[in-house]
């Protein structure tokens, strides 16, 4: 193991087997906090490679508690976080909109580590019980098209890194692993990444993990589709990878000024999303969520982004999404 440590400290990338062995040791609690802190920092500084990410995924997958895979098509939508922007929680909001439109979503969620508000932080504000039983999660998915799998419930090995990550408060390889470790093993996924250089390597990982269809995206320094610049896409379709760029106009949306960018606290994030889902939000937030939903619907086979955006906006402005959120919350209270 010392040879692996030395390689990392010398800013050399590990091969897949070395990464697998390292993260297997982390999963078994054999790496102490000081070692882990230096490893994660060094890997982040030289940039995590495709082989390092894959090796870590395989190591943690072996110790993951699986969620029974439904016999219908479903997707995840998730951002890596780590873009330091602390914008509203777009992926969770988009998941609710898609579910309200009739699409099945199993969202892998966690607390915010490198951002102010993770998906589970927002869900707790909506009084959505993340400690519900596996059976009840499946029941809600069947009836209301969505369920949430809280990472600590399915990945006991994460506990060995949680303290170190919370102290570091920086993006690490763990930001890149979570999107590929959904316990339901979705055939479809939409993943936003915090830097453009990750788009192509992450799409190759989708292919190696045998996803049916998926999109990796990065939009102007954020892990979501952007309204004020170019969104870079790498899409896995029919076992081939296609790279392209999208502009706001491709969604039928007028470009917004970059000056509108604002950081939000967890409380502000919740109130903005609540208001938006009630159909009383600002145009910026409505459209930001809608374009991300549009891309999510694309991987379900609905290829027209402009039409998808219209569908999402109509659903958001109707207030039906908030009613759907409350249905999920109330059904989970019965557990």
Curated annotation (Swiss-Prot):
Its cofactor is Mg(2+). Pfam families: Glycos_trans_3N, Glycos_transf_3. Its EC number is 2.4.2.18. GO terms for molecular function: anthranilate phosphoribosyltransferase activity; magnesium ion binding. Mg(2+) 2 binds at residues 223-224. The keyword Metal-binding applies. Homodimer. This is Anthranilate phosphoribosyltransferase. It comes from Buchnera aphidicola subsp. Schizaphis graminum (strain Sg).
